[in-house]
């Protein structure tokens, strides 16, 4: 199956189509600049329904922060690159809380990294938006998910419109007040994917005051999807995942964090969703044909 970017720019609820494209963009953010451009051209440029697509690479070499912004006539998608090593942001200094958007505090390392590309990022968004109403979306994996969350919060706090956020393997980003204020205005359009034992989703620890934001979307040890799952069920599933991984190389918590695993899981459920939609449309078509055939004179 050839991969293409597809997106519902007007979605107001969870969408597997948008989740798939955001996962693809979060994965692509790890590539080199030239490779990103090549894939966008191949995966967007070959589609007749995608008009006037463009993109821009954002980078600060000093802070090693990267993102890219891509656009069509209808939407803009910002994807932040994650960290090559999940432990890069686990030092005590990096986990300090500092004043952030809204009334709460956020992760100092994430905030400083975002600040280093903020002017370039907002300039790209403004240029691509122009005088058109384009929906604005954010995504990222790992560190990139934290950057995307704070970026969304900053824009919302400044009164700008943002339409959705899909994150994968996201660490906790801010404190209780930040999470409360963020969720008050954006929880219903923020979808935070967690894969079973992904260790990064449990740091920085709650004991340091950190809390999660958004609406949980959970994949269990068997790859099954849960839109809602309680604490105890998640705990037992994590234990099951650990036990199942005992005699395999590597650590379950690190392996579950890999963006390639998120991509595989999201793609599988996206394809299932497409099959369900196709089956529903076919059933509707058959019903219409049946009703027409029973009408007098038809």
Q: Where do the language-model regions lie?
A:
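Non-catalytic, mobile gating and regulatory segments of ester bond hydrolases
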Residues: 1-139, 143-298
């Amino acid at each position: 199956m050839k991969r293409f970017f597809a997106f519902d720019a007007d979605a107001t609820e969870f969408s597997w189509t948008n989740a798939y494209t955001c996962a693809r963009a979060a994965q692509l953010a790890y590539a080199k600049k030239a490779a990103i451009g090549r894939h966008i051209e191949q995966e967007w440029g070959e589609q007749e329904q995608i008009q006037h697509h463009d993109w821009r690479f954002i980078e600060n070499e000093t802070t090693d922060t990267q993102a890219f912004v891509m656009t069509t006539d209808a939407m803009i998608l910002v994807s932040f690159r994650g960290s090559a090593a999940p432990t890069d942001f686990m030092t005590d200094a990096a986990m300090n809380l500092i004043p952030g958007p809204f009334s709460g505090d956020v992760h100092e390392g994430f905030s400083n990294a975002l600040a280093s590309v903020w002017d370039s990022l907002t300039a790209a968004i403004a240029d691509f938006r122009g005088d058109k109403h384009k929906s604005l979306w954010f995504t990222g994996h790992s560190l990139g998910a934290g950057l995307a969350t704070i970026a969304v919060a900053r824009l919302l706090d400044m009164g700008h419109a943002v339409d959705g956020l899909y994150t994968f393997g996201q660490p906790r980003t801010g404190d209780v007040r930040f999470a409360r204020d963020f969720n008050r205005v954006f929880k219903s359009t923020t979808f935070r994917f967690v894969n079973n034992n992904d260790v990064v989703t449990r740091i920085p620890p709650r004991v340091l005051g950190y809390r999660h934001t958004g609406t949980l979307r959970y994949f269990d040890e068997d790859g099954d999807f849960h839109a809602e799952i309680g604490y105890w069920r998640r705990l037992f599933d994590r234990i099951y995942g650990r036990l199942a991984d005992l005699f395999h190389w590597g650590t379950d918590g690190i392996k579950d964090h890999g963006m390639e695993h998120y991509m595989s899981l999201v793609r599988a459920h996206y394809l299932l969703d497409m099959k369900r939609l196709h089956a529903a449309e076919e059933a509707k078509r058959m019903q219409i044909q049946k009703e027409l055939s029973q009408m007098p004179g038809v």
